[in-house]
Amino acid sequence: MSDITIIAIALAAVLMFVFPLMTMSDRTDDVAQLTVETATTEFVDTARSTGKITKANYDKFIETITSTGNTYNVDMEVQVKDDNLGKKVSQATADKIGENVYYSVYTSQIEEALNGKNAAYFCKEGDIVSASVKNTNQTISQQLKNFFYTVTGNDSYTIAAEHAGVVTANGK
């Protein structure tokens, strides 16, 4: 065989096997991205509308995102509205008395409440609930891109979602 034939066979092998593999792995990442975005939005919206984060909802959320076959770092934050009623203003309406200050409660504190006797973290109207999810493992798509292109590093993530909103109901 001539050199051109060997090159043609090698190129055909790449086009027939590697390119479809890369395309399918990218498609898998797209499906995982959509799943994570949907689950994150549903989790935060449920917490916003009910005013509480329950262990059952949190476990369902974690189960849904891990069903994609990846590992994730989930960060939750609740910015608790702290009404400062000690500082008065001249208007006598309930909405304008004092200043509102927010303090943050993070993932570890929320998980402690979920594992406690109530199995829930209760919010009140006006609190802000947010969740952020990022994959911690390298997907097949990332590995192939690293092999062929050397584009991404080991610390990068391709699947991520964030959602936040204001709580509209008291949890207790």
Region locations from a protein language model:
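Low-complexity, flexible helical/coil segments
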Residues: 1-3, 75-77, 165-172
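Serine/threonine-rich low-complexity intrinsically disordered regions
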Residues: 2-3, 90, 106, 139
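Alpha-helical assembly-interface signal, strongest on the long, hydrophobic N-terminal helix that forms
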Residues: 2-63
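Residues in flexible loops and secondary-structure boundaries
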Residues: 5, 9, 82-84, 139
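A sequence-composition feature that detects small, non-aromatic residues
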Residues: 8-13, 32, 39, 47, ...
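Short amphipathic secondary-structure patches
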Residues: 46-122
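Extracytoplasmic
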Residues: 124-128
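Glycine-rich, aromatic-bearing surface loops/beta-hairpins
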Residues: 129-172
